[in-house]
């Protein structure tokens, strides 16, 4: 398990992370969600032991990560802009990574290099951003670390390659109980691979939980009434969002759906329809409730 306790990080006078607390269970795929500039990349670097927190700590299996070579051998971070030597080829980087990760599997490397159609003898500096991303994904899959951290994992991948990568990750989690943490601005990409998530906003984790459980606890409901309704009529509900237009009401509500429906039925609606929500909507509604200006109507 990865545990984060009271973590704070500043750059000069700017606070990037403040009192972050989080538990990530082994064998899970955790989606780190947040707006641009929220500190996701910094948090991943601290998780990987590349950067030291000013306060607090990160522990993996009850051992501190920073300045701990034993723990770091089990961690691989693929950043949004991965490091490579100026004239290095993919083959060169494979051998470089093998020094730090001697269990790098050549069979897996060749399998995914062929799938991604990458020439291992060409210099990475001449690759497109997408091809560079694919190259380091191939290395990550070949290394199969116990803890894999991915910053903007799907950036530069076409839909087929994204699906291939997701399937490979899922297979490795089943076989090796690998723990994967993915940050992405594309929440729809995370929804079908992540089982847990955390929302990083205003320098800290505001909400965290299981994806399915959270989605099951948030409901989008459309109603129509004979008479006009006011916002006060729905104040007994745990509302994330509400739009009242005369006799038509759109709600986003947290809680047990049967209890919510029973309450709304006492208001004798002409029509009531419960709609599914996706992870992107969960993020938007939670952020709005926290007072973050996601969009204006």
Question: What would you call each of these model-derived segments?
Answer:
Residues 56-71:
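Conserved ABC transporter NBD signature motif
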């Amino acid at each position: 398990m990865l545990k984060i306790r009271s973590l704070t990080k500043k750059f000069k006078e700017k606070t990037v992370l403040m009192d972050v607390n989080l538990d990530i269970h082994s064998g899970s795929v955790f989606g780190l969600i947040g707006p641009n500039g929220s500190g996701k990349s910094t948090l991943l670097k601290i998780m990987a032991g590349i950067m030291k927190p000013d306060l607090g700590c990160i522990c993996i299996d009850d051992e501190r990560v920073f300045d701990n070579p034993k723990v770091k051998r089990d961690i691989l971070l693929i950043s949004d802009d991965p490091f490579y030597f100026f004239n290095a080829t993919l083959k060169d980087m494979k051998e470089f990574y093998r020094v730090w990760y001697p269990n790098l599997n050549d069979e897996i490397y060749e399998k995914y290099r062929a799938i991604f159609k990458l020439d291992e003898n060409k210099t990475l500096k001449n690759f497109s951003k997408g091809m560079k991303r694919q190259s380091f994904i191939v290395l990550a899959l070949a290394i199969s670390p116990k803890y894999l951290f991915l910053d903007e994992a799907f950036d530069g991948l076409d839909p087929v390659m994204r699906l291939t990568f997701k399937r490979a990750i899922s297979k490795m989690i089943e076989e090796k109980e690998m723990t994967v943490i993915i940050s992405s601005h594309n929440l729809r990409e995370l929804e079908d691979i992540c089982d847990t998530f955390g929302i990083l906003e205003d320098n800290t984790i505001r909400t965290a939980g299981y994806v399915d459980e959270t989605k099951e606890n948030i409901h989008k409901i459309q109603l129509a009434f004979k008479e006009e309704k006011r916002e006060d009529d729905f104040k007994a509900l745990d509302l994330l969002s509400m739009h009242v237009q005369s006799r038509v009401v759109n709600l986003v509500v947290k809680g047990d759906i049967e209890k919510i429906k029973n309450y709304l039925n006492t208001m004798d609606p002409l029509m009531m329809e419960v709609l599914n929500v996706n992870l992107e909507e969960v993020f938007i509604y939670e952020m709005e409730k926290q007072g973050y200006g996601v969009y204006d109507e």
